[in-house]
Amino acid sequence: MAVFHDEVEIEDFQYDEDSETYFYPCPCGDNFSITKEDLENGEDVATCPSCSLIIKVIYDKDQFVCGETVPAPSANKELVKC
């Protein structure tokens, strides 16, 4: 069982669109991070690369659902929308 340093709402994170990663300041001076893909996969733990602390990310999992299929334009195929 993991021991979380804190529980933080996703709205309190900074989002980097280029890397599709959410960041939150860690007490050690670095940043906790979690990717959009991690959230889509149901992950809720953000880690710090510089220390052993982890935090639980509080978010609405329905906003990060991956796997919805949509018709592909001009094709007889379906695409997965993420």
UniProtKB/Swiss-Prot annotation:
Residues 4-60 form the DPH-type MB domain. Keywords: Cytoplasm, Iron, Metal-binding, Nucleus. Component of the 2-(3-amino-3-carboxypropyl)histidine synthase complex composed of DPH1, DPH2, DPH3 and a NADH-dependent reductase. Interacts with SERGEF. The lineage of its organism: Eukaryota, Metazoa, Chordata, Craniata, Vertebrata. The DPH-type metal-binding (MB) domain can also bind zinc. However, iron is the physiological binding partner as zinc binding impairs the protein electron donor function. It is found in: Cytoplasm; Nucleus. The gene is DPH3. Belongs to the DPH3 family. Its main location: cytoplasm. Required for the first step of diphthamide biosynthesis, a post-translational modification of histidine which occurs in elongation factor 2. DPH1 and DPH2 transfer a 3-amino-3-carboxypropyl (ACP) group from S-adenosyl-L-methionine (SAM) to a histidine residue, the reaction is assisted by a reduction system comprising DPH3 and a NADH-dependent reductase. Acts as an electron donor to reduce the Fe-S cluster in DPH1-DPH2 keeping the [4Fe-4S] clusters in the active and reduced state. One of its GO terms (biological process) is positive regulation of binding. Fe cation binds at residues 26, 28, 48, 51. Pfam families: Zn_ribbon_CSL (PF05207). Its cofactor is Fe(2+). This is Diphthamide biosynthesis protein 3. The keyword Nucleus applies. Widely expressed with highest levels in small intestine, spleen, thymus, heart, liver and lung.
